[in-house]
Amino acid sequence: GLVGSEMCIRDRDMLDEEIAHARNGEEAYAGFKLNSLTDKKIIDKLIEASEAGVKIDMIIRGICCLIPGVKGKTENIRIISIVGRFLEHSRIYIFGSKERRKYYIASADFMTRNTVRRVEVAAPVYNNKLKTKLQEMFDVMLSDNQKARKLEADGNYHRVSNDLTPVNAQEYFYAEAYHEIP
């Protein structure tokens, strides 16, 4: 059911599960769409997860106090920022690989003010159609190569560039909302 920020986020139970899977040689994954990442305890847990072998994708629009891609520390963490014409406030948490995958929609960013001083919630998603939609949305955001910027180990954001078909996640979702995607 519905869980408060202290239980779901700060205690980091879900990441601990993924760390255990990774240490057992199993595939382990976590994905997050947030506006900000500043909470030191969560950052420390993300680093521990990366060191254990958990693959972590993060879409963080704004403040981010974690440097990804540092060998031996955060090399399993990828962080991108997408800033487009729409101000987004959605938060998605994904834990687990394949059949173990769990999805949450949440109100909290990973900021101390949200995890300690505010009442925030994360709601599990049980409906398979909604799970599929959340994964599709997350995948589109990760494939954005127009507005996305990737945070590198040098602490700088660099344009995501590739030779693939141009993808602008916000424009994709806008068009999809109006049934313009073929």
Q: How would you label these PLM feature ranges?
A:
Residues 10-182:
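PLD/PLD-like phosphodiesterase catalytic module centered on the HKD motif
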